Amino acid sequence: MLRNLLLLLLPLLIEAKLPPFFLGRLNGKTLLNHHLDRLTASDGASIQETYPNLQVHNFTQKLDHFDPYNTKTWNQKYFYNPVFSRNNSIIFLMIGGEGPENGKWAANPNVQYLQWAKEFGADVFDLEHRFFGDSWPIPDMQTSSLRYLTTQQALADLAFFIEFMNQQYGFKNPRWVTFGGSYPGSLAAWFRQKYPQLTVGSVASSAPVNLKLDFYEYAMVVEDDLRITDPKCAQATKDAFVQMQKLALTAEGRNSLNNHFNLQPPFDANTTKLDINNFFGNIFNTYQGMTQYTYDGQSNSTHSDKTVRKMCDIMTNATETDVVMRVENLFLWFNQMEPASANLTVMPNSYWDVISQVGSGDLNVLGPDGAAARGWMWLCCNEIGFLQTTNQGNNVFGTGVPLNLFIDMCTDMFGDSMKMSQIMGGNKKSQNYYGGADFYNATNVVLPNGSLDPWHALGTYGTIKSQSLLPYLINGTAHCGDMYPSYDGEPGSLLAARAFVKENVRQFIRYDPNVDGPGGSSSSASLFVVAYIVCGFLFV
């Protein structure tokens, strides 16, 4: 049960005490927007000052696409970039995800798909996800209101948006291609399943389509990455976690952990198993954050510094004989780039602080970061799962992050209507609806994944060339690595991967430079037909 007193905490406390990395995402931002903020750091100029041709609009969206008697509407935010348009009805749509959209994915000409937009003469849109950023179907996040925050409603939002834009901008024989990375990549993949008539293709980067509730495979891939980088790194990590778990068993040992990590609040005589699990979750977050970003093109730090290699250098530093001290050094180093609090030496250590911050349905109490974290947690608890545990048996991280930690979070954040049976039922229903990885079936979709990315374990890898269902595993890259600008010294596999994606986008839109290029006439573009295969799925 939530502690009512803690729900009165100010938004300032929310931003100060949420862990920087929460269920595979940076707090307050989608993974993509976090990366692009680093890539395009400026002197504080607004997005429209930096990109004056970028337009920001709202349009009238339906509240409930599946209840014909519900006529309520709301304003959904989108960005429109006409700079590359040659009026040939080629349209690229970036799908917004689990945080605010800031417009950079519609405007920054250096990201890969905007380079293709320039070459192909595409109009570009970026649609913000319902219940994130400035797009509020209902002006609160009470559990009763969040019934409208589902993947099916989000996909229907996309469909209604495309139909509306076709009319508003007068697109003739439109050739829409959707793009998304991470959770929006899942939406891009599922949109090709459920609404194939509205687009000619999708690029679903790092898209988890297998809706695992207990996502222990995440930790397995992190461990594999450590072993690939340096077998001694994996062993040092295991030794450290074994030692920390031993320390957690006694009052003296817990006091040692207090001193190592400057835990606030510290472990004391009232420490519970839940507190211990929460601590190990915070330690595991550091490994998650390092691995998920490794070698991507977001900034100089991820090119060569904020990498698995650097993490392993710290964990195998022979001059430091105390393996727990190595983990402390890793936390302090990571915390400089992703601060957990204003004091870079402090590790926030209160399970109930997180619950109080994300458990409120009041937007004024939540603040921007708390609202985004609550929305993401709802999606995970209510249907998509992705709960990142260390439940995989014998492993380097031990058993400190069990599924029950997240089940408790779901119940404590959303109430008694969100208990184990409801969580499992909602997850199974969505898995059956979309088919999971084994039964994913669509036409004209490219699904790139990075081999080092823990999320690739939930991808689909069954190629069907006849219907252009095209998974692509990129060796030596991590989360959404294919989407960023190229850089000197990047993994060599990215060059071929980007060329593969681009060529298939070209085929999806049936690009003809004689018609679609400069001086081409959109009126002479031929109407084409794409064959679609639609699968039926079992509803539970």
Swiss-Prot record:
GO terms for MF: dipeptidyl-peptidase activity; serine-type exopeptidase activity
Keywords: Glycoprotein, Hydrolase, Protease, Serine protease, Signal
Signal sequence extent: 1-16
SUPFAM superfamilies in the cross-refs: alpha/beta-Hydrolases
Keyword Cell membrane: no
Entry-linked InterPro entries: AB_hydrolase_fold, Peptidase_S28, Ser_carbopepase_S28_SKS
EC number: 3.4.-.-
Any single GO BP term: proteolysis
GO CC term (a single one): membrane raft
Active-site residues (renumbered): 182, 453, 479
rRNA-binding among keywords: no
Top-level taxon in the UniProt lineage: Eukaryota
Glycan-linked positions: 58, 87, 270, 300, 317, 343, 441, 449, 475
Family the UniProt entry places it in: Belongs to the peptidase S28 family.
Protein name: Putative serine protease F56F10.1
Species of origin: Caenorhabditis elegans
High-level lineage: Eukaryota, Metazoa, Ecdysozoa, Nematoda, Chromadorea
